[in-house]
Amino acid sequence: MEQEKKNIYELLEEDIMNSDLSEADKAAKLSRLLQVRCKQVNIMLVGATGSGISSTINALFDMNVAKVGIGVDPETTTISNFVLDNLVIWDSPGLGDGVERDKRITRDIIAKLNEIGEDGKPIIDLVVVIMDCSSKDLGTTYNLINKVLVPCLGSEAGKRIILCLNQCDMGMKGNHWLKEENKPDEVLNQYLKKKAASVQARVKDGTGLDITPICYCAGYSEDGKEQCKPYNLTKLLHRIVQIIPREKRLALADKINTKKENWEHDDEEDDYGEETTKDFVDVVFDYIEVASEVGGKILGVPGKILGGVAGAVIGTITTIFKSIFG
């Protein structure tokens, strides 16, 4: 019988319990871990039909949560949520398939964005807005941003919205995409930068928010054959982790898609894998309490060490990400 996989909190609890700390110190650290464990992360993905909401969910996270469609018909008909322990993904139906349908979807989005949790804060931590990079008509999405998301999120809108341009391989109708290297050539790269700048300017003009979009490709297949591998998912994940409140980040740690090929290709403007790992390790330092500092690195991550437990705790975190990012 296959042993049930332990989540990140259970692994960290084991590390603390197996340490040589005093019982009082163990109790204190377990208490802080419990505080973190009680935090739930809610991420909503929105966009037009065909922008790739479901394929993005499946590419980022370790779950087969929705059928990924290649055709033009909507694949998701009602707003859905997928629960992975403390991580909840809200998959909003695609917009643009009828006025009445859009009104219903918009009402659902507004209701969810205005929902307040037991802590008195909004349920939704982050909204990922997905646009089709190959589309010239993004009016439906701009309307959603200007008239729904920003008014609902208020003063925190700039901190809780990520703008994404998916299917960047099709930005120039499939031209100038280096299939073997799975990245854009210089011509397409410059086009993508201009496209992102145009979207950024349009959103700023309509809302006053200055948000830099991320160009990426969630990857997709047709008739069982892979058409394009994921590209720049590392950058998107890094942005998500940065925006999620620090005390909630651990909810994502072991819920990331473990397919290494999903994380192999990006724009190389930064080492997103290493930076993401550091973001998670910071949570350990903040909430499991680290007592002393030493030089050097722990499994490649600079930082402080807490007797025997920090090495184990940090080891748990970095092992997860090194197996993914290499």
Predicted features and spans:
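Membrane-inserting effector segments that mediate pore formation, membrane fusion
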Residues: E274-G326
